[in-house]
């Protein structure tokens, strides 16, 4: 049985195209002692993947010929560890492949849920980042104003919804009128500022008349600098 993988055929110098990737077939991997054979069910394809190709993040740069790394939800097909059994659902650092092997102590056993995609989204990296960042660092209190940049993104969207559930006034920052409308209408933010329009500081002052108690930053740069001016 062969294992399909998507590898980096050529590192990009500009926008990604199909020519940057190649589909190959390799022998099925065999788990060693303390390892598990995993079938990749769902994988997360994120904007950060592009940064990995440039080495502009915390992880080593992806090289030409490498299978593209990813975060994935997988099923244990074979286990050589007492930690896990065949049929378990786990989260793992994986690659764009049908099957991978991994050390059992480096994967996380997950509860079985009706909708597996929830394990990738709200219970995955984005949801955990939003929850722990807001609750462990921000410590919002009902009635406070929470400002969130990249509010239409996965982390920002979760942050805003959690803050609203806690009784906070939530103001988002996003790019473009359609995103801002979606953030307010669908995610329930109290307001959303379009950073592409002129007058960001004036818009922040209008949307946050009592100042900002918690700012959840997802972008840095000028948006961060402008937002810090309104912190209580």
Task: List PLM regions with ranges.
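Alpha-helical segments flanking ligand/cofactor-binding loops in enzyme cores
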Residues: 38, 85, 160-161, 181, ...
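NAD(P)H dinucleotide-binding glycine-rich loop of Rossmann-like/cofactor-binding domains
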Residues: 68-75, 86-150
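Short glycine/threonine/proline-enriched tight-turn/helix- or strand-capping micro-motif at secondary-structure
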Residues: 16-27, 56
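Phosphate-coordination loops involved in phosphoryl transfer and adenosine-cofactor binding
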Residues: 2, 142-144, 212
């Amino acid at each position: 049985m062969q294992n399909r993988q998507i590898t980096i055929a050529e590192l990009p110098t500009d926008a990604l195209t199909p020519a940057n990737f190649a589909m190959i077939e390799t022998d099925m991997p065999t788990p060693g002692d303390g390892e598990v054979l995993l079938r990749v069910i769902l994988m997360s394809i994120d904007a950060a993947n592009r940064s990995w190709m440039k080495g502009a993040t915390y992880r080593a740069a992806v090289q030409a010929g490498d299978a593209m790394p990813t975060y994935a939800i997988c099923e244990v097909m074979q286990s050589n560890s007492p930690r896990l059994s065949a049929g378990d659902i786990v989260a793992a650092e994986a690659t764009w492949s049908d099957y991978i092997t991994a050390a059992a102590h480096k994967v996380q056993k997950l509860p079985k849920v009706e909708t597996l995609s929830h394990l990738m989204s709200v219970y995955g990296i984005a949801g955990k980042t939003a929850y722990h960042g807001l609750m462990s660092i921000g410590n919002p209190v009902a009635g406070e104003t929470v400002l969130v940049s990249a509010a239409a993104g996965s982390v920002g969207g979760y942050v805003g919804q959690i803050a609203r559930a806690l009784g906070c006034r939530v103001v988002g920052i996003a790019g473009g009128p359609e995103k801002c409308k979606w953030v307010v209408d669908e995610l329930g933010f109290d307001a959303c500022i379009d950073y592409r329009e002129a007058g960001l500081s004036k818009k922040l002052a209008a949307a946050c008349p009592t100042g900002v108690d918690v700012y959840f930053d997802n972008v840095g740069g000028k948006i961060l600098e402008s937002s810090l001016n309104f912190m209580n």
